Amino acid sequence: MSDLKAAALRALKLMDLTTLNDDDTTEKVVALCHDAKTAVGNTAAICIYPRFIPAAKKALREQGTPEVRIATVTNFPHGNDDIEIAVAETKAAVAYGADEVDVVFPYRALIADNEEVGFELVKQCKAACGDITLKVIIETGELKEEALIKKASQICIEAGADFIKTSTGKVPVNATPEYARMMLEVIRDMGVAKTVGFKPAGGVRTAEDAQAYLAMADELLGAEWADNMHYRFGASSLLTNLLNTLEVTDETADPAAY
């Protein structure tokens, strides 16, 4: 197997296969669940709006892949600084049956030099999650500066985040290798690689992109680190590219899904 194919297979199993569109329907989410099951393995998770969680849980169970985790989003996509609303949304997501919650950090508050609201929001959302994985989206493309990106990453980790995530995918600039390196360096430098993961999201579209991101993680945190407990790709179109790279033609797949 070529290096690119090996990276593609690895990336596929680290994907949070995502649909977070205004026109999402139950049918689209069920189709996403079907796409998460491939001939070469399943994606780590799907990422959907909270209201679709019950339908997704049923679809994943019926197709024999209950181990595919269900991630959802809260305080999304604007990252407002109302802690009460973010916590209420997170509690609701947990009640719906989410396995993982991706919450948006109040990044504009940090830009305005308010560190406390972000810390408190993450801390309280983690308390609402309990054992459920909490990923915190810092919106790197809006923070822009290395000092702010590293500060946001540190605050999230200190407040109890299980993952730090680059982006919502809803702003002009999402994940970039440059931003990813900054965030991975924080995980390394704080000595929290055992307990904190990383998720680039938005803009990771090809096997080559995924290969470069994984190579960076291997370089900074060791070749064994980027497993599905510590690394995810938030993406939608990436899956088709990975399957093409792997030359997968799944007879049982719905051709319309690709």
UniProtKB/Swiss-Prot annotation:
Lyase listed as a keyword: yes
Pathway membership: Carbohydrate degradation; 2-deoxy-D-ribose 1-phosphate degradation; D-glyceraldehyde 3-phosphate and acetaldehyde from 2-deoxy-alpha-D-ribose 1-phosphate: step 2/2
Coiled coil: none
GO MF annotation: an example: deoxyribose-phosphate aldolase activity
GO biological process: 2-deoxyribose 1-phosphate catabolic process; carbohydrate catabolic process; deoxyribonucleotide catabolic process
SUPFAM superfamilies from the UniProt entry: Aldolase
Alphabetized Pfam families for the sequence: DeoC
Main EC class the enzyme belongs to: lyase
Localization of this protein: Cytoplasm
Role of this protein: Catalyzes a reversible aldol reaction between acetaldehyde and D-glyceraldehyde 3-phosphate to generate 2-deoxy-D-ribose 5-phosphate.
NCBIfam families documented for this protein: deoC
Family: Belongs to the DeoC/FbaB aldolase family. DeoC type 2 subfamily.
Record-given protein name: Deoxyribose-phosphate aldolase
Gene of this entry: deoC
